[in-house]
Amino acid sequence: MTKQVFWDDIDVGHKIPGYSLKIDPTRIALQVSGSQDFYPVHHDLDFAKAGGHPDIFVNTGFMQGCFNRLICGWIGDDGWLKKFRMEMRRMNFPGDTMTFQGKVSKKFIEDGEHLVECELWAENEREGVTTPSFALVSLPARSE
């Protein structure tokens, strides 16, 4: 169980605890089969190479799931993910170690709701930041 984060206890610049994953073909194949994304570029090396890619690569659902783990693991059971956006700008291939991180970029109250904007990103050792992302979350306040 994740310790609950409260709006009152964070400030702009607060770091969201990150995590890393080593990517391998099995991890990619399991994710794409589980999400029924059977496009061969995610599991067939020859097909991926014929398309100009050096290897198979992770798909959109994989990235969304990893960011969901990052942000929802941080906000706790009483937090609420209101908006999420990501931009897949670079590829993540087998052999890459992906690191998911974030920080608080803004906090405010709107219509009585305690809101936090978060800058999130995924990076690997080859490309640096591969997927910049954004989340708007609602957090409980200690004063309530």
Please provide the spans of the model-predicted regions.
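Well-ordered beta-strand positions in beta-sheet-rich domains
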Residues: 20, 85, 132-136
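HotDog/MaoC-like acyl-thioester-processing domains
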Residues: 1-15, 92-144
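Mid-chain, well-packed structural core segment of small domains
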Residues: 73-96
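Hydrophobic residues in beta-strands and at strand termini
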Residues: 23, 88, 137-139
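Hot-dog-fold acyl-thioester-processing enzymes
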Residues: 2-80, 144
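Arginine residue identity/basic-tract feature
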Residues: 27, 69, 85, 89-90, ...
